[in-house]
């Protein structure tokens, strides 16, 4: 019985071939938790839910420092502290001020003083380097798939030619070799047409060489368009939130104003009632005082006339 290996997410056991190479995930976990790019720092991470579009580190920074600003060097929306992202800040401390990237022309490429760190002798920024490596990896995988498929077809045709035997074997062998030779250049020509962009490269190095610069540019432009769309979406969300807050403040102000008016009307009404009561009481007291003074006068006049 073949050995089984556990998925790093669901911990169920599968054959080694059924797990992914990097994360060691099964097919269901790869679909449920795909590897996506963080909206802010642009690093790849395993998405836990479809609504979560930022990595855990950026989520913690958002809670601590609030929404980030675009970095003044690389324009990535990851400047939580100051005007520079953490990657550019650390690179600037380590390698000095940034230079212009030879791919995207932004002032965000740091010279590490080592030609081995450069991409085909070019000084590229972090995003352009990732795009280049991603395109290069895809071409390598396509080349590997092409070579494996050609070997499989060659092996099948050799087995068929062995079974046929005799003169038929020789004729089939010549046909198979000629067909394979015709097939491989056709498939190679597709990749060679992709990689030849005015530069001269050898056929063996065409797929691994930097002739895929235009693909890197296209990938970079797509990433920039996606970044701009996300920035626009975020700004629209910020505008909507601000409009919502303004509406809530207006509603709260109107409510408080109506409450104050009602309170003032109630106080005015109460004051009027108290004033009327005091005036009525004052009139009653005046009547009583007049009656007392009148009775005193009558008593005095009676006392004078009695002798």
UniProtKB/Swiss-Prot annotation:
Gene that encodes the chain: FAM76A
Pfam families associated with the record: FAM76
Coiled coil: 217-299
Disordered as annotated region, ranges: 142-195, 287-307
Keyword Coiled coil: yes
Family matches, as InterPro entries: FAM76
Taxonomic placement: Eukaryota, Metazoa, Chordata, Craniata, Vertebrata
Family: Belongs to the FAM76 family.
Protein name, UniProt field: Protein FAM76A
Feature: compositional bias, Polar residues: 161-182
Keywords from the UniProt entry: Coiled coil
Source species, domain of life: Eukaryota
GO cellular component, one term: nuclear speck
Keyword Coiled coil: yes
